[in-house]
C-alpha cells in the first residue's frame, strides 16, 4: 500500500513563497546584469585608451572638392552666373544700420562730432599739426550691388572660391580743415591753413570669397578684391590764409595715390580681410564653445520646465491655490474694502465653489474656505476661485454652477460631457432667468465661443496675418 505525499504548505504560503522567489531572482538579475560591478574603475587607463582610439580615428581624409560639387549639383563649366539680390538686401540693411548708428545722435552734426573724436585721439596730438575739424560730411544714400556670382578654381591644388562682381556708385564726401605748423625758430612760428575735401564717386571690381584651411584649429574666410578693381575719387584742396591756392594738381595726385595704395595694401589680392569662423568643439571667440553653450541652455530650459511642471502637478494634486491664500490671508480685509463688486473666479473640476460674504460691518470676520456666511439681507455672494491652468487652456465646464432655490445657500456643480470642446473661462458670469419648467438659475459666459477660443490662441511673433481670402473661412 503506497502512501501519497501531501504538501505541508497551504495555498497562501505557496503563493507568498513563489512571489518571494521571483523577487529574489529579479533583484539578483538587476544587481549582477543591469548594474556595473562595484570594483574601483581605472579612470586613468580608460582615458588613455580613449585618447589612443581618438588618435586612430582622427586620421580622416577629407573628400575631394569634386565630390562636393557633384553632391551640390554644381558644374563650373556650364553653370551660369547667379543673381545675388538677396545678399544685396541683407548688405543694404547692414550698411543702413551703421548709418543709423552714426546719425542716431544729432543727425549729421552728431556724426561729424564722432568722426572728429576719432581723428583727434586724446593724448596723441601732433606738434606740427593743429586739431582736425570736420566741416562737412555726407554718408551717401546708395548701397553696394553684388551680381554674377560664380564658383571658380582658386589655385592648382583644387581649392574653390566664389567670384562676385561688386559695384558701388554713390557720393561719400568729407571735408577736413586743419593747419600745418612751423615750429622753428619758435613754436607756431608760421601757420598754414589747409582745407581738404575727398569724395568717393565709385568703386567696383570682382570680389573673391574663399574658405581657407584651418589656422590654429579655426577655419577662416578670406575676402578680397581682384587686381582689376577701379576706384574713382575726387579731391579738392585750399591752401593759404589771405592768398589762397585752390585745387593743386600735385596735392590731388598725392592724396589719390595714398588712398589707392591703402586699398591695395588692405583689400586687394593677395591681401585680404580674414573672418574667423566660430569653433564647434573647442573655444571660439567667446570662452564658451557653441555646442557647450547650446547644451547648457538646453539643460537649463529642461530643468526649469521639469521643476515648473512638477510644481504645478503637486499644487493641482494637493488642491493648493494662490487665490485662496490671498482671500484667507492678510489681503482679505483690503479686498473686502474695495468698492467694486468682486469678480467671480473659476473653481477647478471636482470641487465646489466657495461662498463668502463681503460684510460692511466694523468687525471683520475671516472667510472660511468653503462654508457660506449670510449677510444682513440674507443673500449670499459667490466668489469662484481661479484654477491653476495654462494660459492656452481653459475649461468651459467651470462656469456650470447652479443655485437651487429650494435649498438656501446651496450650490451644485454639473460636469460637462466627455469630449466637449475646450473654451476659455468667462471674465464675469451673467445670471440668466430660468426657462419654463426649470427652477434653476445658471451662469453663462458673456463671451461668444469664437472670442473665447481666440483669446488665448497662440500666435507666433513672426506669424503672418490672415490673407483676405482666408477671412471668415473655417479651419
Curated annotation (Swiss-Prot):
Low complexity bias spans: 442-464
CDD domains: SMP_Mmm1
Side of membrane Lumenal, spans: 1-14
Membrane topology (Cytoplasmic): 36-475
Record-annotated SMP-LTD domain positions: 80-278
GO biological process terms, semicolon-separated: aminophospholipid transport; intermembrane lipid transfer; mitochondrial genome maintenance; mitochondrion-endoplasmic reticulum membrane tethering; protein insertion into mitochondrial outer membrane
Topology relative to the membrane: Single-pass type I membrane protein
Biased composition (Polar residues): 353-380, 394-403
Subunit record text: Homodimer. Component of the ER-mitochondria encounter structure (ERMES) or MDM complex, composed of MMM1, MDM10, MDM12 and MDM34. A MMM1 homodimer associates with one molecule of MDM12 on each side in a pairwise head-to-tail manner, and the SMP-LTD domains of MMM1 and MDM12 generate a continuous hydrophobic tunnel for phospholipid trafficking.
UniProt protein name: Maintenance of mitochondrial morphology protein 1
Encoding gene (name): MMM1
Amino acid at each position: 500500500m503506497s502512501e501519497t505525499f501531501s504538501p505541508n504548505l497551504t495555498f497562501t504560503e505557496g503563493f507568498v513563497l513563489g512571489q518571494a522567489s521571483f523577487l529574489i531572482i529579479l533583484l539578483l538579475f538587476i544587481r549582477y546584469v543591469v548594474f556595473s560591478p562595484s570594483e574601483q574603475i581605472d579612470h586613468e587607463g580608460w582615458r588613455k585608451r580613449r585618447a589612443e582610439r581618438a588618435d586612430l580615428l582622427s586620421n580622416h581624409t577629407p573628400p575631394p572638392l569634386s565630390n562636393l560639387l557633384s553632391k551640390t549639383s554644381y558644374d563650373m563649366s556650364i553653370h551660369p552666373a547667379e543673381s545675388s539680390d538677396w545678399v544685396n538686401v541683407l548688405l543694404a540693411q547692414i550698411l543702413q544700420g551703421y548709418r543709423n548708428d552714426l546719425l542716431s545722435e544729432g543727425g549729421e552734426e552728431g556724426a561729424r562730432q564722432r568722426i572728429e573724436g576719432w581723428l583727434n585721439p586724446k593724448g596723441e596730438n601732433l606738434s606740427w599739426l593743429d586739431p582736425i575739424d570736420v566741416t562737412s560730411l555726407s554718408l551717401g544714400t546708395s548701397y553696394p550691388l553684388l551680381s554674377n556670382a560664380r564658383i571658380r578654381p582658386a589655385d592648382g591644388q583644387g581649392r574653390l572660391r566664389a567670384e562676385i562682381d561688386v559695384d558701388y556708385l554713390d557720393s561719400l564726401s568729407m571735408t577736413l580743415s586743419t593747419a600745418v605748423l612751423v615750429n622753428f625758430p619758435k613754436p607756431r612760428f608760421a601757420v598754414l591753413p589747409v582745407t581738404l575735401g575727398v569724395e568717393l564717386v565709385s568703386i567696383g571690381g570682382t570680389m573673391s570669397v574663399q574658405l581657407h584651411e584651418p589656422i590654429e584649429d579655426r577655419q577662416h574666410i578670406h575676402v578680397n578684391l581682384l587686381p582689376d578693381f577701379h576706384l574713382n575719387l575726387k579731391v579738392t584742396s585750399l591752401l593759404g590764409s589771405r592768398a589762397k591756392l585752390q585745387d593743386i594738381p600735385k596735392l590731388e595726385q598725392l592724396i589719390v595715390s595714398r588712398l589707392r595704395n591703402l586699398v591695395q595694401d588692405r583689400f586687394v589680392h593677395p591681401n585680404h580681410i580674414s573672418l574667423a569662423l566660430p569653433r564647434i568643439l573647442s573655444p571660439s571667440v567667446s570662452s564658451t564653445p557653441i555646442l557647450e553653450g547650446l547644451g547648457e541652455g538646453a539643460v537649463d530650459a529642461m530643468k526649469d520646465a521639469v521643476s515648473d511642471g512638477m510644481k504645478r502637478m503637486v499644487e493641482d494634486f494637493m488642491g493648493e491655490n494662490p487665490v485662496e491664500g490671498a482671500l484667507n490671508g492678510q489681503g482679505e480685509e483690503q479686498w473686502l474694502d474695495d468698492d467694486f463688486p468682486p469678480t467671480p473666479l473659476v473653481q477647478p473640476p471636482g470641487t465646489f465653489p466657495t461662498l463668502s460674504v463681503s460684510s460692511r460691518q466694523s468687525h471683520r470676520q475671516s472667510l472660511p474656505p468653503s462654508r457660506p456666511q449670510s449677510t444682513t439681507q440674507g443673500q449670499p455672494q459667490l466668489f469662484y476661485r481661479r484654477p491653476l491652468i495654462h494660459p492656452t487652456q481653459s475649461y468651459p465646464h467651470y462656469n456650470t454652477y447652479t443655485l437651487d432655490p429650494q435649498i438656501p445657500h446651496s450650490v451644485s456643480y454639473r460636469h460637462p460631457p466627455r469630449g466637449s470642446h475646450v473654451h476659455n473661462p468667462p471674465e464675469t458670469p451673467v445670471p440668466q432667468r430660468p426657462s419654463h419648467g426649470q427652477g434653476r438659475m445658471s451662469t453663462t459666459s458673456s463671451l461668444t465661443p469664437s472670442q473665447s477660443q481666440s483669446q488665448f490662441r497662440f500666435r507666433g511673433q513672426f506669424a503672418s496675418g490672415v490673407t483676405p481670402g482666408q477671412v471668415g473661412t473655417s479651419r
